[in-house]
């Protein structure tokens, strides 16, 4: 993450908060904390997306990094992707008739209708008798697939 220092009020501002900082400090211009580059026009800091790392800053000649090579490889891969992408021709849309499947309705011995996809709460809400709810809940079983099934007695 790139962090800037406001040269007007000497406040440390992360890049994501620079626009908000202009409301408090309208004449703000920033200096990157990592690479010490000053952006005096007030807008060019937006293009400053990558910067040197702390290792590179403090180790100077001792630092051996492949940052430039990685960036070049990424650019090459992006160019290859753009070249290999076929030009898409708009295909004609074929409308298929929508066929609704009849819902499976399973009736229990208590006369409770079980619809596939219906929540257990709604099923229990339709039941009036407390004893029927109790026996219904006792007959629910979890199968080997982890699904709740109604065990027929």
UniProtKB/Swiss-Prot annotation:
InterPro entries: LYAR (IPR039999), Znf_C2H2_LYAR (IPR014898), Znf_C2H2_sf (IPR036236), Znf_C2H2_type (IPR013087)
Main location: nucleus
Record-level GO cellular component terms: nucleolus
GO molecular function, one term: zinc ion binding
Binding, Zn(2+) 1: 6, 9, 21, 25
Biased composition (Basic residues): 65-83
Compartments reported by the entry: Nucleus, Nucleolus
Region feature Disordered, mapped onto this chain: 63-96
KW Zinc (keyword) present: yes
Keywords: Metal-binding, Nucleus, Repeat, Zinc, Zinc-finger
Positions bound to Zn(2+) 2: 32, 35, 48, 51
Chain intervals annotated as zinc finger (C2HC LYAR-type): 1-26, 27-52
Family: Belongs to the UPF0743 family.
Protein name: UPF0743 protein YCR087C-A
Organism: Saccharomyces cerevisiae (strain ATCC 204508 / S288c) (Baker's yeast)
